[in-house]
Amino acid sequence: MTVPTPYEDLLRLVMDTGTPKADRTGTGTKSVFGHQMRWNLADGFPLITTKKVHLKSIVYELLWFLRGDSNVKWLQDNGVTIWDEWADADGELGPVYGVQWRSWPTPSGEHIDQITQTIETLKSNPDSRRIIVSAWNVGDIPQMALAPCHAFFQFYVADGKLSCQLYQRSADLFLGVPFNIASYALLTHMVAQQAGLEPGDFIWTGGDCHIYDNHVDQVTEQLSREPLPYPTLKLNKRESIFDYTFEDVEIVDYRHHPAIKAPVAV
């Protein structure tokens, strides 16, 4: 069986053709602009195999987004520290992803729960072209500890299958993107389950797709490894998308190469 390698192909493309660029963190990158990857979720769960990816952090982060939370305490209580570098002394991050997903502020002072709205629309009007969730709230960005990197996603229904396309304006290919791929693939499974649909495709669209200069050695090592078949996902069904727990998510037959450590650009 041929193993799909869209992620590794993108790493190779950026290594071979990327433009050297300065960046907000002062680290420096190789970058390409505009790229798309696609996975058929019926063919396996897209958890990268050329290095071990920390599934616990991915699942808890997604559940944290779905809680509408903006404080790292719940993550820390569950052993996840991936947001600690950006939090203030009280653990606050400002109106980041979960806040925008669950309580987007309106000019009238009300709030929109985009996730609830999305699932309701998928059930009542699945052919709508407006089934979109945005974390990119221009008015709130100055109050965010970090502007949304994965900013906007859209759902699409065809033949009883739910597909999701994510737009990621800034893509840290070595550290961040493997998390983002798995997170949104899992979210697609959850939303499909709640809407009575089968999972379709997950499409990842990247804007500034970059490899940090201090990740080049790690990427070189990763690309020397043979990709392995993707695992599969078993997801317990819950009454509501907000009821899922870590224990409801089981990844089966995740075969992978060893983890590769690298510094985070803050």
Swiss-Prot record:
**What does the UniProt entry say about where the protein is found?**
Cytoplasm
Q: Mind telling me which InterPro entries this protein's record contains?
A: Thymidate_synth/dCMP_Mease, Thymidate_synth/dCMP_Mease_dom, Thymidate_synth/dCMP_Mease_sf, Thymidylate_synthase, Thymidylate_synthase_AS
Q: Where is the signal peptide?
A: none
Annotated binding of dUMP, by residue: 24, 129-130, 169-172, 180, 210-212
The UniProt family comment states: Belongs to the thymidylate synthase family. Bacterial-type ThyA subfamily.
Subunit composition?
Homodimer.
Q: Which organism is it from?
A: Rhodococcus jostii (strain RHA1)
Pfam short name (any one): Thymidylat_synt
| Entry EC number(s) | 2.1.1.45
Q: What is this protein called?
A: Thymidylate synthase
Which positions bind (6R)-5,10-methylene-5,6,7,8-tetrahydrofolate?
54, 172, 265
Q: Name the domain of life.
A: Bacteria
Pathway(s) of this molecule: Pyrimidine metabolism; dTTP biosynthesis
**In the UniProt entry, which residues are flagged as the active site?**
149
Gene Ontology molecular functions: thymidylate synthase activity
Recorded coiled-coil stretches: none
Q: What's any GO biological process attached to this entry?
A: dTMP biosynthetic process
Q: Any idea which UniProt keywords this protein has? A: Cytoplasm, Methyltransferase, Nucleotide biosynthesis, Transferase
What NCBIfam families does UniProt report for this protein, alphabetically?
PRK01827.1-3, PRK01827.1-5, thym_sym
Q: Give a short account of what the protein does.
A: Catalyzes the reductive methylation of 2'-deoxyuridine-5'-monophosphate (dUMP) to 2'-deoxythymidine-5'-monophosphate (dTMP) while utilizing 5,10-methylenetetrahydrofolate (mTHF) as the methyl donor and reductant in the reaction, yielding dihydrofolate (DHF) as a by-product. This enzymatic reaction provides an intracellular de novo source of dTMP, an essential precursor for DNA biosynthesis.
